[in-house]
């Protein structure tokens, strides 16, 4: 009986030690609305920060800006009198109101993630880690965004790393 009890305690302890994980469905976005799925990104809590593992297809090859945005919506919204893709997601997650784009290692936006790398076949599968984000609770009900073009992790020479328009989006539940 003692062995059975010890086995149950060990099993429960191991189950409780399992890190949290969330799968985010990613969809193309346009000024008209949310489009087709291009795959998923799995977010895992790790000792080194939140790890984002993409399982994505149909993306333009190269580097893309990759961010957590403040609002949990991928819908278009009006900006300067025009409908803009996924504008309802708001800006980069910045709970400290730093107003700075300094990348995942810097002290600016908390939503700044490492760039997403897409191979020549349009597939993204390389995980990236955001060391300043420790818990899924920090990103719950926020939007995960892929931008057209790269990100130099600076506000110079262009604001927000020079990334382009919003290309794909998913809501973190």
Curated annotation (Swiss-Prot):
Its cofactor is Cu cation; Zn(2+). Its EC number is 1.15.1.1. Keywords: Antioxidant, Copper, Disulfide bond, Metal-binding, Oxidoreductase, Periplasm, Signal, Zinc. The keyword Aminoacyl-tRNA synthetase does not apply. InterPro entries: SOD-like_Cu/Zn_dom_sf, SOD_Cu/Zn_/chaperone, SOD_Cu/Zn_BS, SOD_Cu_Zn_dom. Zn(2+) binds at residues 92, 101, 109, 112. Binds 1 copper ion per subunit. Belongs to the Cu-Zn superoxide dismutase family. This is Superoxide dismutase [Cu-Zn] 2. It comes from Salmonella typhimurium (strain LT2 / SGSC1412 / ATCC 700720). The gene is sodC.
